[in-house]
C-alpha cells in the first residue's frame, strides 16, 4: 500500500472509493465521502437545503458545510438523521445559520439508542471499537491500517478535539411517515440495518433515496465491538423495499 501496508489487493483497491470527494448526485443533491466514517448528504429543495446526517462531531459537519458552500449559498432549512450513529455534528448547522430554528427529523428510537450506547453498554463498546476500527495500528509499515471498510478511519484526525454537537430530533416517527420538507415530498420507511432506528429516505420528485442499508462492503452482521446480532432477514426486507423504489440515485 501507499504507506507500506501488506494487504490483499482488493482491500487496498477499496481505499480508492473512500477518497475524500464531494460528489454531485444529479442536479439537486451532493454526498461528501471520506470526511469521516460516515457520509454527509445535502438535498436541494425549493425552499433550501436539507442536511442528512451530521457526522461524529461539530468539526466534521463544519468541514462538510465548507465544502457545500463551494457549490451553493442556499441556506440549510432542515436536517434529517438516517440513524443514531452520525448525529453529533448538528451544532455546526446552528453555528452557520445563527439560530436553531429548523426542523430535525428522525426515528423515535434515536434518543434511546444514544442513551443506551452512551451509558449502560458504552464502556464495552468503546473497548471493542479499538479492535473493530484498528485504532492501535501504526500509520505506516507492514501492519499499518489500510481502511476500516466504511471509511478510511474511525475519526478524521483533522477534526480533533471532536466536539460533541448533537441536537435531538424535533419531528420523530416510529413507522412509515410522509412529510413535506424544504418544499419536497419526503417518504420515510423504517429499514433496520446496523441500527434499529435506520430509515430509508425517499425523495420521489428527485428519483433519489438516501439509505443506511445498501453498503459498498460486506454487511457487518455482528460488530466485534460488542453490539447485538443484526438479523440479516430484517436487512433483506429493507433491501427489497429499496429495490422496489426503482430510483435512479441511491
Please annotate each region the language model reported:
Residues 17, 22, 47-48, 58-103, ...:
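Active-site metal-binding motif and surrounding structural segment of the metallo-beta-lactamase
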Residues 18-72, 200-203, 207-213:
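Conserved beta-strand hairpin/beta-sheet module of binuclear metal-dependent hydrolase folds
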Residues 43, 62, 90-92, 114-119, ...:
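Short, solvent-exposed loop/turn and secondary-structure capping segments
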Residues 1-19:
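N-terminal pre-domain segments of enzymes
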Residues 54-55, 83-84, 109, 213-214:
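Active-site metal-binding loops of divalent metal-dependent hydrolases
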Residues 78-134:
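Hydrophobic or amphipathic alpha-helical targeting/insertion segments
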Residues 24, 48-50, 56-58, 113-191, 234-238, 243, ...:
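Metallo-beta-lactamase
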Amino acid at each position: 500500500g501507499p504507506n507500506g501496508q501488506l494487504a490483499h489487493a482488493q482491500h487496498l483497491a477499496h481505499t480508492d472509493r473512500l477518497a475524500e470527494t464531494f460528489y454531485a448526485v444529479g442536479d439537486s443533491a451532493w454526498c461528501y465521502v471520506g470526511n469521516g466514517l460516515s457520509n454527509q448528504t445535502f438535498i436541494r429543495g425549493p425552499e433550501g437545503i436539507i442536511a442528512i446526517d451530521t457526522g461524529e462531531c461539530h468539526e466534521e459537519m463544519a468541514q462538510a458545510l465548507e465544502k457545500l458552500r463551494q457549490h451553493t449559498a442556499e441556506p440549510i432549512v432542515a436536517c434529517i438523521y438516517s440513524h443514531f450513529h452520525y448525529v453529533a455534528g448538528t451544532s455546526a448547522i446552528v453555528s452557520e445559520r445563527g439560530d436553531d430554528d429548523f426542523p430535525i427529523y428522525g426515528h423515535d428510537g434515536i434518543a434511546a439508542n444514544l442513551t443506551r450506547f452512551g451509558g449502560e453498554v458504552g464502556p464495552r463498546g468503546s473497548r471493542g471499537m479499538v479492535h473493530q476500527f484498528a485504532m492501535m495500528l501504526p500509520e505506516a509499515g507492514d501492519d499499518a491500517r489500510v481502511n476500516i471498510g466504511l471509511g478510511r478511519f474511525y475519526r478524521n484526525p483533522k477534526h480533533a478535539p471532536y466536539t460533541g454537537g448533537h441536537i435531538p430530533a424535533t419531528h420523530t416517527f416510529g413507522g412509515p411517515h410522509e412529510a413535506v420538507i424544504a418544499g419536497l415530498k419526503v417518504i420515510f420507511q423504517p429499514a433496520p440495518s446496523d441500527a434499529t432506528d435506520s430509515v430509508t429516505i425517499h425523495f420521489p420528485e428527485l428519483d433519489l433515496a438516501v439509505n443506511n442499508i445498501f453498503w459498498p462492503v460486506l454487511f457487518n452482521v455482528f460488530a466485534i465491538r460488542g453490539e447485538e446480532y443484526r438479523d440479516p432477514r430484517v436487512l433483506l426486507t429493507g433491501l427489497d423495499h429499496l429495490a422496489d423504489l426503482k430510483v435512479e440515485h441511491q
